[in-house]
Curated annotation (Swiss-Prot):
Binds 1 zinc ion per subunit. Its EC number is 6.3.1.13. The gene is mshC. InterPro entries: Cys-tRNA/MSH_ligase, Mycothiol_ligase_MshC, Rossmann-like_a/b/a_fold, tRNA-synt_1_cat_dom. It is an enzyme of class 6 (ligase). This is L-cysteine:1D-myo-inositol 2-amino-2-deoxy-alpha-D-glucopyranoside ligase.
Amino acid sequence: MHSWPTPDIPALDGTPVPLALYDTADQQVKPVEVPPSGSGTPVGMYVCGITPYDSTHLGHAATYLAFDLIYRVLLDNDHQVHYVQNITDVDDPLFERAERDGVDWRELGTSQIDLFRKDMETLAVIPPKDYIGAIESIDEVIEMVSTLLEEGAAYVVDDPEYPDVYASINATENFGYESNYDAATMAELFAERGGDPDRPGKRNPMDALLWRAAREGEPSWESPFGPGRPGWHIECSAIATNRLGHSFDIQGGGSDLMFPHHEFSAAHAEAAHGVERMAKHYVHAGMISQDGVKMSKSLGNLEFVHRLTAAGHEPGAIRLGVYAHHYRGDRDWSDEILAAAEARLALWRSAITVATDVQAAVDAVAQLRTHLSNDLDTPAALAAVDAWAEAALKDTGNVSDTADQFDTPEFTPAGRILAAAVDALLGVRL
């Protein structure tokens, strides 16, 4: 499956700063273990993609914008990046939405994937090298499920009508290491987030579905263990390890995926391939709320990217609004946050046309690099650019924070240095 066009990313002078990120499993900020820069071996990064039954809302976008920063900082450090993202294009929510709307589930999925691509391109998100749907990875899933069955890490339930295949929660010794949740929390989240603890025939209520035996009215594919379709978690295990290797560098997504999805995805891969950790670094982005209430389809309070841009809001302002708070924290979105981001964008655009101190711009870029490399500290990074812009305007006596007269700005040499860094590292075009 194709992704979307790659944005132009300026190359920067100066010294980049190696990236450190909070690791969910180890519960600390630590240097990201990656191949040496210039070695020709890419950094392997896997991020869970969408289930394509609705448009891209700010919660989705915030996650992909966080990993876009990671990609950009790695590029600045002269690393190649092999970025893989999946699309869960066969799953219950997709079927349910298609039935509700009276459309074919394939058509719904195709239309929403197209919208997602457009939103990501609009937001200048660097695309994955491999953008892989669950349907196109069916053979890979079947191979991994077969391996787990052969290793005794999975079993078929004793149900002649629906012989589903499940993974044993005891297949790995350190299950739970990624989320660090206690047993009660895991059981609660498993039931809330797509698990089936009461399914008859399971050996343990927490065993996860690997292969759902064919049901009437659902798509299915032939396999050695009967016709059916993939479970949610095994899809990501297979897609990631078939492209990045049995153990790779960075795995991540939204914090709501930490358990059960990421915990089980890692466990399936580790049991199948005999590795201790599927990823060296587990990274999770916080959730977005709307005016203090968590964004939810059921509440109808989603803010969609395409609606914001259709209303005339610039992609750069949307990015700055998301980056106003740290990626790991749950954070709010409001009209006031967007307005503040637009004012910030105008301030920076004013400064790049009048800034004269080249060394000050170089120093600001160094601060920007330092803050982003410190667990993507975007609030500090944006504040550093703010301080540079305010100083530049103060030096010239121009305190205007409106951008009307800067529709086609002529960058000064100092402004050009800063604008290139903001573009390359933050994905914001000035």
